[in-house]
Amino acid sequence: MDLTTLTMIVMLAVAAVGLDTVWHPTEVILQASTAGNIDKITIDQNMIDGILRSEVDRISATQTLVGKPRVELGRQGGIGMAIATAANLQSLAYALQQDVGYRPDQIGVALFSENGVVKVLVTGSGGQRVTGFEQVVVQQNGETVIDLLHRAALIGMARVDPYLTALSLMQRHETDQDFSDAETLITVAKGKIAPTPFSFDRSLFENLQGILALFRGNQADAHTWFRLARASNPDNIAAVLNLAFADLQLDQYREAADRMERLLHDTPDCDAALASTGYVTWAAALLGMHDVNDADQVLAKAIAIKPTSSIAWHMWSEVKRQKGDTVQAARLNQQALNVADTFENYAEIAALYFRLTWQDRQPVMRSQFTNPAAKSLH
């Protein structure tokens, strides 16, 4: 059974979200407990702790441009995980008790049984951004207790960090392309963002919507979402890279080339993976304009910045092939395969999932290169 359900997302819609600060936690404290006896189930505190930590670690392991939270297991009892009785769970005291002003995000899960039905109470808080929340998650038909606990942990993370959770869900389902939960989570989270012209968070979500449009093969929609993401935050480098990627999909090679030239000029200290992607995208645009020699030079820069970029080596092999150097093309293509087991790119970058195109009227095609961690999820 899939660990995610739309029930999780519907409950999110009623969560009160404060938007005075960026919507991403720096620290998440996990708390777990059991309340009362649960018939025919053998599960102890260590098992619950491990399941909770495993699910949150899986989400936090997503290769993202946004800072990831430091995750720690808290001592049982903080965040109100002390339950008076199994029959009085709604009186849970989840108020945070910190002597100083800083309050880390907290997620608590309490496994219990009520009228013979196994349930998990998910509670938590997100500092100034997310008020205290409480949600009961009921075991579904055919769902194991372990899967129930994984789902509960996912719900908790969706409350305190909907962006990272949506990003993780998108990557989990890139093979079966069932993005319904990720898309609904994005829609609900965006609905909580103030309609200001500039929004760091809205830009991140719009960028994800562009990638999801590419998964559906809708090039025009993807271009629109990436353009909106850049408008919401012009400093969102992922959105600018992806907008150029979408330019290529629409055969707008000059626009893509100009966009990448400006980006690389304006951000000389850009992250190596992003800068290399910028040069590769620029090279693809040059190929689309039949400028093979300049594409050759641009790709040399991409490789110099990030020698482990498979897409850069692969694109360079294509340039050599077009120049008639088949021996060099084969060597460079082999090098692309040799470095394919290293970090390729961030989850927000379209080139991680799809091939850069330099030929007219091409459909969206999946890339043969991806991150090693992403491969292990399928």
Describe the residue ranges of each PLM region.
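Hydrophobic/aromatic packing residues within the alpha-helices of TPR/SEL1-like helical repeat arrays
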Residues: 186-190, 226, 253, 260, ...
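TPR alpha-solenoid repeat register
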Residues: 202-205, 239, 273, 278, ...
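Catalytic-center loop of serine/cysteine hydrolases
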Residues: 75-183
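Short beta-strand->alpha-helix linker/helix-N-cap micro-motif
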Residues: 26-117
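Short coil turns that delineate tetratricopeptide repeat
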Residues: 194, 200, 234, 268, ...
